[in-house]
C-alpha cells in the first residue's frame, strides 16, 4: 500500500494580527510537513463575519512568508483543493448539513438567545454544566418536540440554527500524537450548533468538513482546541470518514505561568518585527516553545532547514511553554554575531537612509553608506548591539557628530590639564601616517610615557569627544574607522565646549 502524502494546515481567522501562538502552530505544521516531504496549506476560516478585519488575511500570509513559512497551497498560491477561504465554500457546508439532517444526526433549533441564556442561568444555579436543553429535539429523534411544530416554524420563516445530536451514554476517545490516549464522556458534550442563523457554519462544522475534503493527514493545533475534539470526532463518525491524526500543542505561558496574554507583554508577531527582531531569531525562539531536540545536544541556534531536519512531534512536550523574552534577546544577539555583514548591510542601509533624511552629517555620505565603511562598523559593533537597527541608532556617532557629551563621564575623566594634553596630542594625529588603530595606539602611548602619565588620561577623553559616550568598541579601531578629519574636528569642537576649573 502506498503511504498517503502528508498534508498539514494552518487555519487562522482573519481577525487582526498574527499571534505568536499562531506563528508556532503554523511553524510546527510547516516543519512537520517538510520533514515528511509533504505539503503545508493555509486555509482562512472567516465564518465569523462579525470579527473579520479588512486586510488581515493578506497580513497573516505576508507575516508567515516573512518568517520563511511559505504555503504550498493557499488563497494566494491556489491549489487543487480550493477555495481556501471558508466564506467561499458555503454551498459545500449546506450540502453536508442537509445530509446530517436527513440521517437524523442533526436537527433544527428555534430557541431564542433569551431562552438559551435563561436555561444557562438555571443550570448554573443547579450546579450543572451549561448545555442545550434539547427543547427542539424532534420526537422521532428521541426528543419531545412534535414535528408539526417544527414544520410550522419553518413555514413561518422563523430564524433557526442547526444542531448536531450527540449520542447519549457513549465514550469518545482518540490517540493524541503528543498526549497519548484522551477520552471524553458524551454526557459532557453539548449539542453543538453546526449552522448559524445567518447561513454560515460554525468553526467546528466547517473545519471538520474542510479537513476531510482537503485530505489533511495531520491536524496540529493548540491545546485550547482539545475540548472540541469529541464534537469533531462525532462528525467524522456521522459522515463515515476516517479522521486524520491529531496533535495538540502545549499552552504558551507568561513567566508567572499564567496564559500568555497582551496584558503582560506583546503577543503579536508584528510587534516584535517593529522592534527589530529578525525572522531567524523569532522562528528559532518560537520553535523551542514546546519542542527540544532532546538530551545529548547543547545546540540552541538553528537555521530553518536544521529545524526541518530535526523536528519531530515526539519531542514536543505536554506542559505549558514559558515565553521568556530574555531568551529571544539572547538568540537575536547570537544571530547578529554570526550573520554575514552583507546581509546586515541590506537591513541597516534603509535605516541609515531614513536617519540621513532627518539629520545632517559632516561625514561623506558616499563613504558612510558604502559597503566598506558599513562592514567596519558592523565588525566593531557585533558584540555590542541587540538589534540590527542599533548598528545605526546605538552607534550613531559613526554617522553623525555627537550632539552632547555624557555629563558624568566628563566630570569623572576631565582634569585641568586634559584640554592642553588633547591639543598637544592633536598635533601628533595631524601628521600620523598611516592613520590606523595600531599607529594611533603607539602614538598615544609614546606621547604619555615621557610625561609619566597613564594612557587612560587620554583614552577616556578621546572616546567621549569622538562618540559623545564613555563606552563602545576599541577606541583605536573606532578612531581609524571615523578617519583623521572627523577625529580632529571632534576633538577641536570638544575642547571648545568642555572646560574644567583649575
UniProtKB/Swiss-Prot annotation:
Motif 'HIGH' region: list the residue ranges.
12-22
**Binding-site residues for ATP, renumbered to this chain:** 262
InterPro entries (UniProt xref): aa-tRNA-synth_I_cd-bd, aa-tRNA-synth_I_codon-bd_sub2, aa-tRNA-synth_I_CS, aa_tRNA-synth_I_cd-bd_sf, Glu-tRNA-ligase_bac/mito, Glu/Gln-tRNA-synth, Glu/Gln-tRNA-synth_Ib_cat-dom, GluQ/Sye
User: Mind telling me which GO cellular component terms the entry cites?
Assistant: cytoplasm
The terms under GO molecular function for this entry are:
ATP binding; glutamate-tRNA ligase activity; tRNA binding; zinc ion binding
**GO biological-process terms attached to the record:** glutamyl-tRNA aminoacylation
What is the residue range of the motif 'KMSKS' region?
259-263
Q: What class of enzyme is it?
A: ligase
Q: What are the entry keywords?
A: Aminoacyl-tRNA synthetase, ATP-binding, Cytoplasm, Ligase, Nucleotide-binding, Protein biosynthesis
Where is it mainly found? cytoplasm
Q: Which PROSITE patterns match?
A: AA_TRNA_LIGASE_I (PS00178)
Signal peptide positions on this chain: none
Is ATP-binding set as a keyword in this record?
yes
What EC numbers are recorded for this enzyme? 6.1.1.17
What does the UniProt function comment say about this protein? Catalyzes the attachment of glutamate to tRNA(Glu) in a two-step reaction: glutamate is first activated by ATP to form Glu-AMP and then transferred to the acceptor end of tRNA(Glu).
Stated family: Belongs to the class-I aminoacyl-tRNA synthetase family. Glutamate--tRNA ligase type 1 subfamily.
**Subunit details for this protein?**
Monomer.
Name the chain's protein.
Glutamate--tRNA ligase
Q: Which organism is it from?
A: Chlorobium limicola (strain DSM 245 / NBRC 103803 / 6330)
The root-end lineage is: Bacteria, Pseudomonadati, Chlorobiota, Chlorobiia, Chlorobiales
